[in-house]
Structure formats: C-alpha cells, structure tokens
C-alpha cells in the first residue's frame, strides 16, 4: 500500500504561531513538514503577509523567517485568476480570499489556520472541498489519515 503525502496549506497565522511557539501544535506541523511527513503548501500571499507582519510586530524574527522559508522549501500554490477569486471575494477580505482560493487551486488535503473568525464563518467552507481546521485538529486529521497504515 502506497502512502500519498498529506498536503497541508499553512495560513499565515499558523506559520507565525510556529515561529513564536515552536512547542505548540503549529510548531509540530512545521516539524512534520521539515521531516517530509507532510507537504507544506503556501501561496505567495502567505509569504508576503508573514514577512509584513513579522517586520512590524517581531522585527527580530525577519531573518529567521526568511531562512526558515528556504529550509522548508514549501510547495507554492498557483496564483488564482480573477475568475477563480470572485466567489471567495463574496465571503472574505481580499487577502484571505487570495489565500483560500490558492489553497483550493492547489487541491490540498487540509487548510490549517488560527484565523477562525474569517475562515470558519458561515458559508466559507462551502467554497472548498477540504477541511478548514486549527493546528490541533489538523494533527488529529493527520493521525486519522495515517491510522490504516499503522496496522
């Protein structure tokens, strides 16, 4: 039985949480990505947003952030076209729409975020065919996904 790689789209909030608290669930997901157990997927918007947030709130982490991106070498989701983006813009801000639409175009296994206010509001999940989860729930999904291969 061949185990396909579990591809997880990391929202900016989860990536930053992993940098700030490597011992948490977000940090564990990054370690799984480092080990090649899961495939980290991001979009150009996530990288730009992370750099912008860190430059303003945690400037001491900007260089570490850039080194980590190079080390992790995430898969880059395709940039969405205006047509792809339209239904996402009806429910989300421009930045969030760009991120979730890119995840959708990348056909990921899960979308992991700490931004529950926006990504988990009514109607957003109907735009995608994958679960939108917080890091601890993503770890539980991963465990459930690999369970059949452990026996």
Please annotate each region the language model reported.
Residues 109-110, 116-151:
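Acidic, PIN/NYN-like endoribonuclease modules and their adjacent C-terminal/linker elements
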Residues 1-6, 149-151:
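Intrinsically disordered, low-complexity and often Lys/Arg-enriched segments
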Residues 93-110:
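Acidic, metal-associated active-site segment
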């Amino acid at each position: 039985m061949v185990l396909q790689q579990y591809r997880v789209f990391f929202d900016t909030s989860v990536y930053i949480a992993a940098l700030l608290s490597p011992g948490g669930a977000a940090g564990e997901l990054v370690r799984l990505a480092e080990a090649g157990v899961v495939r980290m997927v991001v979009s150009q918007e996530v990288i730009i947003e992370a750099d912008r947030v860190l430059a303003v709130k945690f400037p001491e982490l900007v260089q570490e952030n850039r080194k980590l991106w190079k080390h992790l070498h995430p898969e880059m989701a395709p940039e969405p076209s205006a047509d792809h983006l339209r239904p996402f813009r009806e429910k989300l801000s421009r930045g969030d729409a760009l991120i979730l639409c890119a995840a959708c175009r990348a056909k990921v296994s899960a979308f992991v975020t700490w931004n529950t206010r926006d990504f988990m509001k009514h109607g957003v999940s109907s735009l995608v065919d994958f679960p939108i989860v917080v890091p601890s729930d993503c770890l539980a999904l991963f465990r459930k996904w690999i369970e059949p291969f452990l026996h």
